[in-house]
UniProtKB/Swiss-Prot annotation:
Gene name linked to the record: degQ
GO molecular function terms listed in the Swiss-Prot or TrEMBL record: identical protein binding; peptidase activity; serine-type endopeptidase activity
Residues of the active site: H109, D139, S214
Protein name: Periplasmic pH-dependent serine endoprotease DegQ
Main location: periplasm
Binding site residues for substrate: 59, 109, 139, 212-214, 230-234, 269-273
UniProt keyword terms in alphabetical order: Hydrolase, Periplasm, Protease, Repeat, Serine protease, Signal, Stress response
Entry-linked InterPro entries: PDZ (IPR001478), PDZ_sf (IPR036034), Pept_S1C_Do (IPR011782), Peptidase_S1_PA (IPR009003), Peptidase_S1C (IPR001940)
Amino acid sequence: MKKQTQLLSALALSVGLTLSASFQAVASIPGQVADQAPLPSLAPMLEKVLPAVVSVRVEGTASQGQKIPEEFKKFFGDDLPDQPAQPFEGLGSGVIINASKGYVLTNNHVINQAQKISIQLNDGREFDAKLIGSDDQSDIALLQIQNPSKLTQIAIADSDKLRVGDFAVAVGNPFGLGQTATSGIVSALGRSGLNLEGLENFIQTDASINRGNSGGALLNLNGELIGINTAILAPGGGSVGIGFAIPSNMARTLAQQLIDFGEIKRGLLGIKGTEMSADIAKAFNLDVQRGAFVSEVLPGSGSAKAGVKAGDIITSLNGKPLNSFAELRSRIATTEPGTKVKLGLLRNGKPLEVEVTLDTSTSSSASAEMITPALEGATLSDGQLKDGGKGIKIDEVVKGSPAAQAGLQKDDVIIGVNRDRVNSIAEMRKVLAAKPAIIALQIVRGNESIYLLMR
């Protein structure tokens, strides 16, 4: 036993000597590397940018359930009891885009229903903030820091110059942990079809984005803003490397409108259309898979005056190729009325270009699922009743869709939602922004006034 112990001790000593020798050899390496160029790092860029990315804290009260009118309870029973408004707190991120004015860009869903908004900088300072304006369709909101001092603003890049494979860095306040930076690449551009409410024309990235990152910055390696982090695809509730950001050009345009008008003024192209598909390409004998197929041109619209025709395929907008109808809709909806845009078309297989002046009319149209998924399959527009009253006209209902199953029919006119009178799509959006558990639509159909109920 004694010999064994000595042997183990000797082995230990031997190993110790060997490790020490190895350590001495390794220890000399840093001295050799010190004279070489420094390792690549994002630290210098982030040191300049982090002061411009802020944490957004909101407080407010929200109803936990929609009060059900007595006359409707017989249809739904008492399984949705009335709930009093409950206080809530929320966390998100934001980006300072104007230091002297204290303007901060964030997501609409971060500040929705907030009654108090506060901003915390990365140096620990806190400020109260007020809402300048917001837009639920694009999920953009503009805040203003009260009594700002010694702020840092972020430079904004041209997101139209992005390419798939460009490096990207996401900065925000995930889970309330504090400022966090993650890196990745631009995975895709013009991403749509995510079944989100509103406009979809996203930058996709694999830079990790989590809850609390909403409203934060997506940056290029120069530290310039290329997007506002907005959503993630998260089957399990956490990041799986598929995040989405609103392009900086779109965010900048919307922010300027909110500064100038306090709201978003949308241009109207005056067409109805759908995504280009292999079936459409085959039917028209075309070798094109991307773009927007024009199914109808509204009479008297800017497109009609410019000569756009049903059956045309819109392949580009202002010289930039279009991937989808969703991208076209998103880009037009963030352009002011009266703006002239150039459309690249394919007609009978031949390319041509037309210039369209976006309508300045206050009329509006929208796919109903952009307002609430319960109305998916219906196309809406601001309309008029026979007596001159205003409402929301049902232009089209897709057979078998949720809207059709709920009982909506073409030419119905919605005049009320949950006892609130609505005269326009904009007013309907505001009523449904609270996401009521029960939706009761008051509809004029011919000479009758009826109610349709849906969850």
